[in-house]
């Protein structure tokens, strides 16, 4: 059975019948073939095909774990168990519980005293970095299930884990990966000094409310820079993770490579995690929907980094 899919939906185990919208190149895959490895996936991404025709009788189909009517917590739990063993999920849940006191201390101290607990943040990041890759991948999935009281904690932890995992897949050294994890953990620290009712407002924000929310990168940056041990990379993530590649972001309207690399990485991980969050009161987006939206958000993300995220994190099956 032939089926047309988007390039980012391709997985190892699929049988490709045809690449559409790309010139044939001997150095790139074309014709009919089975995708056997991550190297094949990288070559597929390099083809820049508009769409891919697969044969679902000769290879695997696209993910159909989610019902078309949307994602709810029960459906997502079943989805997790289709990718991770009960032991991996239990290890991920334990990792979340072990980091909870450290991350909560960071958030509470920021909220009550406008201060950054550097030691607590470092302990949380070390815990995530010490876990096996499979546990970290499961943690990213488990952390998508959020209620209103756990949202900030789990989002901060999940973005940190995403940035650590992406950094490893980009081949960065351990110190740079550690800084990515720390930056991911505190990227929204400035929100802790904003009114809670504003952050939880269900409807559309007024212009004044939106302007206030958009002060959180600068507020977080001011809080972090009081701590002498915080590196420039962490400060850059906090201050610039809402900048957009075309210059339309905030707070400073930076564009292209003027946006620090670490902040461009953070922008991708932050948006992906937010889009795929599963809440009891809100339909979450599937991974395919989130990636499709991000790919078509022209000007928002560094296109090369986004391509790497899709290839090395999504298509490779590192995250689900």
Regions found by a protein language model. Name each.
Residues 124, 145, 180-183, 216, ...:
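Short acidic/histidine-centered micro-motifs embedded in hydrophobic/aromatic stretches
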Residues 1-116:
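Membrane-cytosol interface segments
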Residues 33-34, 170, 203, 228, ...:
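Helix-turn-helix-type domain boundary/helix-start signal
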Residues 183-194, 233-242, 261-265, 281-283:
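A glycine-rich, aromatic-flanked flexible loop/lid motif
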């Amino acid at each position: 059975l032939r089926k047309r899919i988007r390039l980012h939906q391709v997985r190892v185990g699929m049988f490709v019948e045809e690449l559409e919208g790309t010139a044939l190149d001997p150095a790139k895959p074309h014709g009919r073939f089975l995708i056997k490895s991550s190297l094949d996936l990288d070559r597929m991404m390099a083809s820049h095909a508009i769409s891919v025709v697969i044969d679902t009788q000769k290879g695997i189909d696209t993910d159909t774990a989610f019902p078309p009517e949307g994602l709810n917590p029960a459906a997502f739990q079943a989805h997790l168990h289709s990718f991770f063993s009960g032991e991996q999920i239990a290890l991920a849940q334990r990792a979340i519980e072990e980091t909870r006191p450290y991350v909560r201390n960071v958030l509470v101290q920021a909220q009550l005293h406008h201060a950054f607990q550097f030691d607590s943040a470092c302990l949380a990041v070390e815990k995530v970095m010490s876990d096996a890759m499979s546990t970290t991948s499961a943690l990213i999935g488990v952390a998508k299930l959020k209620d209103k009281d756990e949202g900030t904690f789990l989002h901060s932890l999940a973005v940190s884990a995403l940035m650590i995992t992406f950094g490893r897949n980009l081949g960065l050294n351990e110190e740079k990966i550690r800084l990515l994890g720390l930056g991911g953990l505190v990227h929204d620290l400035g929100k802790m000094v904003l009114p809670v009712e504003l952050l939880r407002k269900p409807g559309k924000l007024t212009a004044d409310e939106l302007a206030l929310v958009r002060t959180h990168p600068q507020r977080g940056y001011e809080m972090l820079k009081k701590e002498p041990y915080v590196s420039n990379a962490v400060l850059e993530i906090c201050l610039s993770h809402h900048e957009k590649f075309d210059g339309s972001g905030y707070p400073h309207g930076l564009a292209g490579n003027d946006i620090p690399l670490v902040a461009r990485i953070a922008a991708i991980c932050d948006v992906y995690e937010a889009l795929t969050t599963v809440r009891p009161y809100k339909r979450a987006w599937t991974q395919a929907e989130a990636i499709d939206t991000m790919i078509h958000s022209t000007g928002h993300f560094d296109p090369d980094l986004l391509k790497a995220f899709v290839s090395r994190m999504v298509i490779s099956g590192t995250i689900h």
